[in-house]
Regions:
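PAPS-dependent sulfation machinery
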Residues: 104-206
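Conserved phosphate-donor/acceptor-positioning beta-strand/loop module used by diverse small-molecule
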Residues: 209-210, 220-245
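Glycine-rich phosphate-binding P-loop
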Residues: 74-91
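Charged, amphipathic alpha-helical linker segments immediately N-terminal to NTP-binding catalytic cores
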Residues: 2-51
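Post-Walker A helix-loop "phosphate-sensing" segment adjacent to the P-loop in P-loop NTPases
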Residues: 91-101
Length: 255
């Protein structure tokens, strides 16, 4: 199967501090030098906008209250149909959700949405490479993407650096995770959800879809005791074959 050459990366609008930390924690493939330089370029170019957004959100995030309107989580193994279910439930206007634009430009979304949303729509493929599901800048997507943009404490970092499964072990299944590391994960995750809620109007209930959360139910309930979970499953043989396809089309092209 032909390997898909991914032109963009979730770490484009991260921080230099996070990028250096990830480089120190991983041995990067020599084949991906061009992508590494692109990441550094976009990190530097986005720095002023990240500072402006941080200042803008400094007092606003503290006013977002997720205690009284706790999230609904769609969970299930990768390739089980979580995206289809997320798209379907997101049609209900009582919910707000993370859209692709905010996910990709998370650190600058509030200050760049007027001019960057049409740019993203122009450059985005019309379908996802792994399954041909239609996407655009407004499509619902999973919050694990911006989590990788904010911290190394994300299971998806193992997707970006497939030779290092520490991220998955420590921040998906919380195996051998120190208590202070778990607290740090909760803090950054909660702050991220507040930012997602604020982007769409903080009074709506958050609808979140994230296969990584399937292994985090206990930790999420510590954060949101009244949260609801919707679990979807699929024939495991189909799931296995679909994940092989996902690996060959996207994950294989990472660092």
């Amino acid at each position: 199967m032909r390997e898909e050459e991914i032109q963009e990366h979730q770490l484009f609008i991260s921080s230099l501090f996070l990028w250096v930390k990830l480089k120190m924690q991983n041995k990067l493939s020599s084949k991906r030098k061009k992508m590494r330089w692109k990441i550094i370029f976009f990190i530097i170019a986005s720095t002023p906008f990240r500072w402006i957004q941080s200042s803008y959100l400094f007092f606003k995030l503290s006013k977002v209250n997720l205690e009284t309107n706790q999230p609904v989580f769609v969970i299930g193994h990768w390739r089980s149909g979580t995206t289809h279910l997320h798209y379907l439930i997101a049609q209900d206007k009582q919910f707000s959700y993370l859209e692709a634009f905010q996910a990709f430009f998370f650190r600058v979304a509030f200050v760049s949405k007027t001019f960057m949303r049409p740019v993203l729509n122009y450059f985005m493929p019309s379908t996802r490479p792994q399954d041909n599901i239609k996407i655009d800048a407004s499509a619902p997507t999973e919050e694990e993407h911006p989590l990788t943009n904010l911290t190394e404490k994300s299971g998806m970092q193992t997707f970006f650096f497939p030779q290092n499964k520490t991220y998955f072990d420590k921040y998906n299944i919380f195996e051998n995770t120190k208590e202070n590391e778990k607290r740090a994960w909760k803090k950054v995750y909660h702050k991220m959800l507040c930012q997602i809620a604020l982007f769409h109007g903080k009074d709506k209930k958050l609808l979140l879809k994230n296969p990584h959360n399937t292994a985090r139910i206990k930790v999420l309930l510590e954060l949101y005791p009244k949260a609801k979970f919707i679990f979807i499953h699929r024939n495991p043989y189909d799931v296995y074959q679909s994940n092989i396809h996902l690996y060959n089309k996207t994950i294989k092209s990472q660092f």
